């Protein structure tokens, strides 16, 4: 069995100097006879039998202790490792060859890889569209800002011109107001009241045709109108029934004429200079004037 697992070139037996089987039969035997028989027979193996096998066994035992696996001895004296022994590892360890499962990623299928590829393409397209839309919005914003500033400058120039014209009209109106205030002060007061009054807008379809009973003007605070109806009511009342200190004094010529007439008739002149008609002292002969008027139609009949 040992020679069966050995290498092909390692099972050659050592050659001896004598060849017993190749001896020439025609050779003449030696005179002594014994010496010739030893040379031509098995005499050449005497040294091998005398202790040669023991030396080989000792060497085999020593090598079997030091070597790994099952050593196989050869007749030639060499040994080869067993074919069933494990192969020595390169790194010198006996751990696992593959990395741990935590470090190994999950194996992705074909559908998952295709989905990831399609998703990456969709995300790139979406990002590109967002960048284009952002650039478009910024461009439109710049154009809007430019147009807004141009329009604002134009409005400012127009407002300046209109304000100058309104200021001229206002100054002329103030001069006219102060010139005519002492002559017709009630008219001047009525002109101070604003005529253009903003109406209250109410929500709802039913309130469109209805108008508020009180018209108000917007006050200094937004959303809180100022009510001027009471002011108008007081001014109208003062116009129709002015107090004594607001009554106009009579002209100087009318006052003098009234004083003279009063002195002649013996009646005092009124304060405002008006002259009352003189009452007739003559009484009708037939009684009261009312009775005379009643009798006149009867006489005509």
UniProtKB/Swiss-Prot annotation:
Keywords: Coated pit, Coiled coil, Cytoplasmic vesicle, Membrane. Pfam families: Clathrin_lg_ch. Residues 111-147 form a coiled coil. It is found in: Cytoplasmic vesicle membrane; Membrane, Coated pit. Residues 29-51 have a biased composition (Low complexity). Clathrin is the major protein of the polyhedral coat of coated pits and vesicles. This is Clathrin light chain 1.
């Amino acid at each position: 069995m040992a020679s069966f697992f050995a290498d092909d070139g390692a099972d050659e037996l050592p050659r001896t100097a004598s060849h017993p089987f190749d001896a020439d039969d025609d050779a003449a035997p030696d005179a002594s006879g014994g010496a010739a028989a030893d040379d031509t027979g098995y005499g050449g193996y005497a040294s091998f039998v005398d202790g040669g096998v023991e030396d080989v066994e000792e060497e085999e035992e020593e090598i079997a202790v030091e070597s790994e696996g099952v050593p196989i001895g050869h007749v030639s004296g060499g040994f080869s490792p067993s074919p069933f022994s494990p192969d020595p590892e390169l790194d010198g360890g006996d751990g696992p060859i593959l990395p741990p499962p935590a470090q190994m990623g999950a194996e992705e299928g074909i559908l998952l890889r295709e989905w990831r590829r399609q998703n990456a393409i969709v995300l790139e397209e979406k990002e590109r569209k967002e960048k284009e839309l952002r650039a478009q919005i910024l461009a439109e914003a710049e154009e809007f800002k430019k147009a807004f500033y141009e329009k604002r400058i134009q409005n400012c120039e127009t407002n300046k011109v209109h304000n100058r014209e309104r200021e001229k009209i206002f100054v002329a109106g103030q001069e006219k107001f102060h010139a005519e205030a002492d002559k017709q002060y009630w008219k001047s007061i009525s002109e101070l009241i604003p005529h253009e009054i903003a109406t209250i807008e109410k929500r709802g379809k039913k309130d469109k045709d209805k108008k508020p009973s009180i018209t108000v003007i917007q006050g200094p605070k937004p959303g809180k109108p100022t009510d001027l109806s009471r002011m108008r009511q007081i001014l109208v009342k003062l116009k129709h029934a002015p107090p004594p200190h607001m009554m106009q004094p009579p002209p100087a010529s009318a006052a003098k004429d009234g004083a003279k007439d009063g002195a002649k008739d013996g009646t005092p002149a009124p304060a405002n200079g008006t002259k009352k008609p003189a009452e007739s002292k003559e009484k009708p002969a037939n009684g009261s004037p009312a009775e005379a008027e009643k009798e006149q139609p009867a006489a005509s009949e």
